[in-house]
Amino acid sequence: MWVHPAGNVLIDPLPLNEHDENHLDSLGGAAHLIITNSDHVRDTARILLFTGAKSWGPHAEKEQFPFDCDDWLKDGDKPVSNIEVFCMEGSKTPGELAILIDETTLVTGDIIRAHEGGRLCMLPVEKLQNRELAVNSIKRIDAVKSIEAEIPGDGWPIFKNGHDALIELAEKL
């Protein structure tokens, strides 16, 4: 969750238990909920009922997404101030989203992961739709020099030197 003056933003939330719901409520609830790809829907429908948040999903998955979002995001969209959307082509789902917050924190769905502390890796090749497009998407993100933190949908977050970790990943590809 990102605490934001225009309402808190949830990105790919996990299912919430009663304690989580109470804690979220104590922080002001959630006004916005972004799903990076259809594999991260999880308990979103129930969370939306609980919070009343506006929901966004990847535009490229609009026709087959498991539920109707309030709006659909494409590359370059800015659904909330200080959030920029990147579409990560070639991943396991069409138009997977990566979310850049305050130009310093990157939240990714599945294409970029971290199964080892301090090191990023790419989704295994056999799960990619198109390796070349996936690599190009990652290299496009590594051009954002202001990234300090990288929070992958799968694995360990990197809280310092996120840009360096992205460059290291891109060089391995």
Each model region followed by its residue ranges:
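Active-site metal-binding motif and surrounding structural segment of the metallo-beta-lactamase
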Residues: P15-P58
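Short secondary-structure transition/capping segments
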Residues: R46, F67-D70, G162-H163
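Alpha-helix initiation and capping sites
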Residues: S38-V41, P79, T93
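Short gly/pro/ser/thr-enriched loop/turn and capping motifs at secondary-structure boundaries
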Residues: V41, K62-F65
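Metallo-beta-lactamase
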Residues: W2-L16, S26-A30, G57, Q64-F65, E84, M88-L173, ...
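Short, hinge-like loop/turn segments at secondary-structure boundaries
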Residues: F50-K54, W72-G76, E168-L169
